[in-house]
Amino acid sequence: MPKNKKVPLRKSVVSGDIIDKRNLLRIVKTKDGEIAIDPTGKKNGRGAYIKLDNQEALIAKKKKIFNHSFSMDVPESFYDELISYVDHKVKRRELGLE
């Protein structure tokens, strides 16, 4: 009898929903204090997750969610980069490319 693989679950910092890790995007703060999008989910550092959803990315910018999650000032340009990245990923998913 085949053994079922465990599906890792993570909590979105924006909505608080607990979702399958594959449907989330990881944002990481490295030891150097740099904030980056982590598409592979394997970068070293403190991670926070949001849903791959345009609305969540906009709420994250509006409420400056990552300023609280990482206890530092995250530049506005990072939030803009995040919104465009999420929009790109959502469109690819809708086209069936991912």
Model features per residue range: what roles?
Residues 4-5, 96-97:
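Flexible extramembrane loops and terminal tails that flank transmembrane helices
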Residues 64-94:
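C-terminal structural segments of small proteins and small subunits
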Residues 50-63:
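Short Cys/His-centered divalent metal-binding micro-motifs
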Residues 20-37:
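Short recognition patches in nucleic-acid-associated and regulatory proteins
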